[in-house]
Design a protein with these regions (language model features):
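Hydrophobic N-terminal alpha-helices or hydrophobic patches in metabolic proteins across all domains
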Residues: 1-164
Length: 164
């Protein structure tokens, strides 16, 4: 049973090698080119479904440059399901990857992964790849649990609340 549920927009499915971002006006997906040009880890192939939590804006990240439009809270969705670009789904936060640059990544699971309830439950090889991939541009300071992930989402929420 998924406890805290958030709505997730998938920008880059697991296994994809292109950088994509939903435009700020939410009208189109922008293809920003091959990921390996920016993140050569795993030859640029996304090791986990990547997107954002709908109804959030990342306040920590945007405070570095007040002229920049803030991004939504990033989410890495651990799932056995394959997703399409632009698909929305539901997930449950289990942890948060805290990066030095403030661009933290919430880790969530969906109903296909009942055996994964916390970061430590993810197989070691997959965790290591996720950490190398998302730690390439900015060092990872620490990994925190579900409570901290939910608190971070709520602190960056612009509408609604996490469904319990």
């Amino acid at each position: 049973m998924i406890k805290n549920t958030v709505e997730i927009f998938i920008e880059i499915p697991k296994g994809d090698d292109r950088r994509r971002h939903l435009s700020y006006d939410k009208k189109q997906m922008l293809d920003l080119g091959p990921t390996k040009n920016v993140i050569p880890v795993n030859n640029g192939v996304m090791p986990i479904a990547y997107g954002f939590i709908i109804g959030t804006l990342q306040k920590d990240e945007s405070s570095k440059n007040p002229d920049e439009i803030p991004d939504e809270v990033d989410v890495l969705l651990y799932s056995k399901k394959s997703f399409s670009i632009g698909e929305t789904t539901k997930g449950s936060p289990i942890s948060i990857i805290i990066r030095e640059d403030g661009d933290h990544k919430v880790v969530a699971v969906d109903s296909t992964t009942a055996e994964i309830r916390k970061w430590e439950d993810i197989p070691s090889a997959e965790k290591e790849l996720i950490l190398r991939y998302f730690g390439y541009k900015s060092p990872i300071k620490k990994i925190e649990g579900e409570k901290e992930a939910v608190e971070y989402i709520e602190a960056n929420r612009v509408q609604g609340k996490i469904k319990k």
